[in-house]
Every structure is written in structure tokens, then in C-alpha cells.
Amino acid sequence: MIQTILAVSIAGIAGTLLRFAAGTWVSANWPRYFYAATLAVNIVGCLIIGVLYGLFLSRPEVPVEIRAGLIVGFVGGLTTFSSFSLDTLRLLESGQVPLALGYAGISVFGGLLATWAGLSLTRL
């Protein structure tokens, strides 16, 4: 159990740092599009989780430490629903209702599509 906790923790740090780097870069280069980093990491994270899930289904021998580390730790640290919610609220409060609705729709449906695509890639 301690090995699983360590794997999740270490991979979570990596995912979180990658999300932080994406947010920092977007804020520095495109401050008007602050939400783009959250959108990107959530869509990419959905693709990654789909691929990992498909791989782990076909390879049950992969140790639980690796599975949990990558899915719960890395992807969990990389993606974030709370930031998505805050970004959407900020857009709504600033009167950018169409953009907020588009962002929310793309995030949800894009995430579902990316997860499906990732899983499908493992079935080729």
C-alpha cells in the first residue's frame, strides 16, 4: 500500500507541475485567454486517461502502483474540474456568456470525445 501511495504522490506532483506550467505560460503569453490552459490540460488529460485505461484493460498484469500512479496521480494532478468551473464562472461574470457556454460545452464534450479516442487508440 505504501508503494501505491508513493506512486500516486510522485506522479501527482508531476501532473500538477505540468498543469501549473501550462497555466503560467498561457497567462504570461495570452492573458485574455486564461481559460485555454485549463481547457487544454483537461482535453489532453482525457485523451491520456482513455489511452491508459485501454492499455490497462488489455494488460491486467501492470502493477496497481503504476496504474494508480498514472491515472489517479498524474492525470488527476494534470486535470482539474474546479479550475474549469472557476474559469467558466469568470467568463460568465465578465459578461462573456457565449464564450462561457462554448468553453463549457467544448470542455465536457471534448473531454468525452478525447477519452473515447484514447480508449479507441488502444483497440486498433
From Swiss-Prot:
The keyword Ion transport applies. It is a multi-pass membrane protein. GO terms for cellular component: plasma membrane. The chain crosses the membrane at residues 5-25, 37-57, 69-89, 99-119. It catalyses: fluoride(in) = fluoride(out). Na(+) is not transported, but it plays an essential structural role and its presence is essential for fluoride channel function. One of its GO terms (molecular function) is metal ion binding. Pfam families: CRCB (PF02537). GO terms for biological process: cellular detoxification of fluoride. Na(+) binds at G76, T79. It is found in: Cell inner membrane. Belongs to the fluoride channel Fluc/FEX (TC 1.A.43) family. This is Fluoride-specific ion channel FluC.
